UniProtKB/Swiss-Prot annotation:
Molecular function per GO: DNA binding
GO CC terms in record: cytoplasm
UniProtKB keywords: Cytoplasm, DNA-binding, Transcription, Transcription regulation
Protein's UniProt name: Uncharacterized HTH-type transcriptional regulator YvzC
Matching PROSITE patterns: HTH_CROC1
Gene: yvzC
Organism the protein comes from: Bacillus subtilis (strain 168)
Length: 77
């Protein structure tokens, strides 16, 4: 049975960090999340919760679909 999983558009965030010469720690501080949380979300180890999604959308001034997408995972496997 497929399950929706919210994923971040990792390439967008990484390119933003390169373009603005930001470290992961600097960006996390700017967004208002812990560096560990940002790292786990970017690496797919953690799904972003509502608070993280809200903070990131506010910081980047983007719509949900511009920064995140739904991935469908088969739970039966």
């Amino acid at each position: 049975m497929p399950v929706e999983k919210i994923q971040i558009r990792r390439d967008y965030v990484l390119q933003y960090m390169v373009n603005n010469d930001y470290s992961l720690n600097q960006l996390a501080l700017e967004i208002g999340v812990s560096p560990a949380t940002l790292s786990r979300v970017l690496n797919g180890e953690r799904r972003p919760g509502q608070l993280v999604i809200g903070k990131m959308l506010h910081y980047f001034n983007l719509k949900f679909e511009d920064l995140f997408y739904y991935d469908f995972v088969d739970k039966s496997q």
